[in-house]
Amino acid sequence: MRAVRKTLRRLGWTPVLLAQTELPLALPSAPHSKHPQGQAPSSSGSTASGGDPNLSAFSTLGAQNSFPRSHDTDPTDRSADRLLARLGLLEDAAPLFGCAVAVPRAGVLLALPVLGTSGVFECAQKIYGNLGPAFYGLRTSLLTLLLMALWRIKRPEGLKEYSPQELGRVLGLDRAPEVKTLRRKLAQLAACGRAAQFGQALAHQRVARRGKDLGFLYVDGHVRIYHGKLRLPKAHVAQMRLSVPATSDYWVNDKTGDPLFVLTAEANAGMVKMLPPVLKQVRALMGERRVTVVFDRGGYSPKLFEQILEAGFDFLTYRKGRFARITRKHFQVHRTRVEGQCHTYLLADQKVRLLKGKLRLRQVTRLKENGHQTPILTNREDLPAAQIAHRMFNRWKQEIFFKYLGEEYALDALVEYAAVPDDPLREVPNPTWAAIDAKLRQAQAHLDRLQAEYGLEALTNAEKQRSTMRGFKIAQGKLGQTIWNAFERVQQLEKRRNAVPRRVPVQTLTEEPVVKLAPERKHLTNLIKMVAYQAESDLVRLVAPHYKRVGDEGRTLIQSALASAANLEVTDTKLRITLAPLSSAHRTRAIARLCEELNQTQTQFPGSGLRLRYAIRESS
């Protein structure tokens, strides 16, 4: 109680004020907050001595400001706000900044304008509401996770390597949340089960801002290998040429490689099964607009092509399987210019029919210098052949996206060990059928070899010695009997295989519970990394006119700026961020131009009225 009294005296509270019935029992923004009947909220309230309403944080019931206010005045001591959170009177600690020099990693604040335009904070507020009374509320937790991704702190455990006080100064807090706190916040969000809704809301925001760049959408699966002890469905990993326990995610990216949304496949379903639900979500995002979807050979299915066309989409994909090679004389040089770069291809353009002639498509085949032919199928008749080839080969940007997120953002990291029940009636390949089928294939191969040997003996038979077939059979009687035995074994194995179902419910194959990895927390962290990557991409686009090597070094430049130290200067209405110069003068000049563009956005720090003003010190 003595500590409480000291805190109250420091805040300037009086016994009269403490006796008022208007003491807030719930935050005004809480969805179920109500005033007692017959009582109107008072407009009077106490503000900490010297506290600036534009800086931060706590709002009483009668507060009229658009941002809550804090009872703390010292940015390094937020004990009053922590006390209010403990008493259940605070949903989220508002940012409170102090002037500081060379704050480590404060350059990450450059990302706030583009994070703000992504709508991530508004979407989170709409979908999740709040996390209840807390010092680290929804906004603070979400901002921490986003900045961690941009700092390349790939897991909550990585926070152990950084000073909470230093990270807190960037967040406008006395301390950043630590590992257990952040895990608990993620668990709270995952318990809501709304990651899919959150992802849809973010995708709607992205479409609203960049709809013109979404005429071509690239769909591809990404396999996350599982190394734990749970028995999970297997997926084929192309790099390993093996089927291993894993989880498959299907990402949809735009033509620049930036992600739009992600879906997790049930039991590692293939592209043919996953494309219909993916296109259903694309239709919900894009409306009736006709979109071209681009995917690899995993989605090759003429019947699926019909479904895609009936759903009002166009498509591009590689042709799978055998096809008639095209003679050299049918190939011609085609050129196209995209984003200022000229692309040249040797192409043959022709019409093909699938499904016994019912499906007519266009095939554009590329010929490489080594003679390899790559056929591309599409229904688009309006595009030049070179454009079709370029759009198809542009898939490499999505592959680079997977590689970049895996290395820089730990896309494949296991977020939690928890498992949830899976469908026990889900059908899987029957291992008994597979074992018999393997024996049958071996037996059939053995029979084929014996028959080939018998045929060779017949072909080389000397007629002078054995002029009749009867004589040949007698001479080859031992080989003939071996062939009959092998034939009978093949027939027996075929009967055994036909008596066994090819697929069975998964529950019949194991006595252990049928489970899968808990998807919610992983989906949520994927969305956070997706938004961080989008913000990084937006910054690269903004700096592109001012940096010649943006294609090769754009992301490296932005990453260096986000990781740099900065001076913080606070006024009544502004937070000035002055970055330290970068490694060279031309890189510093590029970031200076970026700062000028960001200043035009008039962005406010999330949760406060402070407008952000950026600058960078010139190289000495």
Q: How should these model regions be labeled?
A:
Residues R2-R5, R183:
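Key DNA-contacting residues within the recognition helix of helix-turn-helix
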Residues R5-A19, L189-G193:
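Short, solvent-exposed alpha-helical "recognition" segments
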Residues T21-S243, S248-N268, P276-K280, A284-L285, ...:
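Dynamic "connector" segments at or just before major functional cores
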Residues A80-R86, E306, E310-F401, G406, ...:
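An anionic, glycine-rich sequence signature occurring as long contiguous blocks
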Residues V293-K303, G321-A324:
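Acidic, metal-coordinating catalytic cores used for nucleic-acid/nucleotide bond scission
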Residues D314, Q332, P384, M392-V428, ...:
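C-terminal, active-site-flanking charged/polar segments
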Residues Y404-T460:
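Charged, amphipathic alpha-helical linkers/stalks
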Residues L450-R497, P501-V504:
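Extended alpha-helical coiled-coil "stalk/arm" regions
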